[in-house]
C-alpha cells in the first residue's frame, strides 16, 4: 500500500476496530460531509484581497473572469447564498476545472493539477459518499 508511519498505524487501527465491531455483530456506517473531484483544467480569475481562496468557487466584489468558463451567480440572494456586501458575486468551476489567480498561476497550476478538491457544484462533490458495513451472518 505504500503507507508508512502514522498512516499505517491508522489503517491498522481502523481495521482492528472494524473487525472487532463486526465480530460483535454491529453495523457500521462510514461517511463524509461531501465528495471530491479530481481537478486538471485551470481557469484564470482575478480578484481583490477579499476574494475567497477556494479552488472550486470564488466569492467577492471585483472578480474578473471569462463568463464562458464558469457558472456565475451575480445576485447571491436569489439563490440564498450569503453576501458579504452589496456587490458580491459567486463563480463556480465546471467539471474538472479549478480556479487560479492570474498572479503566480503557473505555480498554483503545478501544485493543484490532478489533486482532489471540493467546494464546487459537480455531482461528485454534492453527493455525500457513504458505505454500510454489516457483519457476516
Role assignments for model-derived ranges:
Residues 3, 36, 121:
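Gly/Ser/Thr-rich helix-start
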Residues 17-46:
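Metal-dependent active-site segment of extracytoplasmic phospho-/sulfohydrolases and closely related
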